[in-house]
């Protein structure tokens, strides 16, 4: 696990990326993978606070400015079965510690199959058009910090960012708790 704020150079090099920058806190392997997996699937919502604190420290230290923090929404059934949306809990913790207000203008409109194990093209195809903007006025001309737990291929974040920008957001910056291994990170 690394404590440095990192930008994945592969993500930054992709011309179709809709976000301004993509940041991550750690690499999703070893202890980080185990702990995040517990947070997501092991009924451990209390881990949002220490994870959120680490994210908030990096946001403050690196002066990432945003008008709003927006978490990636889960579909209703997944949130119901899990009991919480881990990205929402992270966003709430980060908002509380940074003073950047949080809002949830996005809604998932399609149920989807699990993304783990799918390739990049399949993920992007599955997630295209997966979100709608509940309140376009909330994001109009605003700089959004989009929060999620794990950045794998970027398909979920891509779909969410496109929806926010199509609704009038000035910019979207992505910040995830972790990034899957195999991608060079810039510090």
What are these model-predicted stretches?
Residues 92, 101-187:
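PRPP/pyrophosphate-binding module of the type I phosphoribosyltransferase fold
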Residues 1-97, 116-117:
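Extended interfacial segments that mediate partner engagement and assembly in macromolecular machines
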């Amino acid at each position: 696990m690394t404590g440095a704020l990192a930008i994945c150079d592969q993500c930054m090099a992709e011309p179709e990326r809709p976000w301004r920058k993509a940041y991550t806190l750690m690499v999703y392997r070893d202890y980080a993978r185990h702990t995040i997996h517990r947070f997501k699937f092991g009924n451990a919502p209390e881990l949002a606070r220490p994870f959120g604190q680490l994210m908030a420290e990096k946001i403050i230290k690196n002066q990432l400015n945003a008008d709003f923090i927006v978490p990636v929404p889960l579909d209703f059934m997944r949130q119901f079965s899990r009991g919480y949306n881990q990205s929402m809990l992270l966003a709430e913790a980060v908002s509380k510690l940074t003073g950047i207000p949080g809002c949830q203008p996005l809604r998932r409109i399609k149920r989807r199959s699990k993304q783990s194990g799918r390739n990049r093209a399949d993920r992007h195809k599955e997630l295209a058009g997966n979100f709608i903007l509940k309140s376009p006025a909330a994001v109009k001309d605003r700089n959004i910090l989009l929060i999620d737990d794990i950045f794998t291929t970027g398909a979920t974040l891509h779909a969410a960012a496109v929806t926010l920008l199509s609704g009038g957001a000035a910019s979207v910056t992505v910040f995830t708790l972790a990034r899957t291994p195999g991608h060079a990170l810039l510090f």
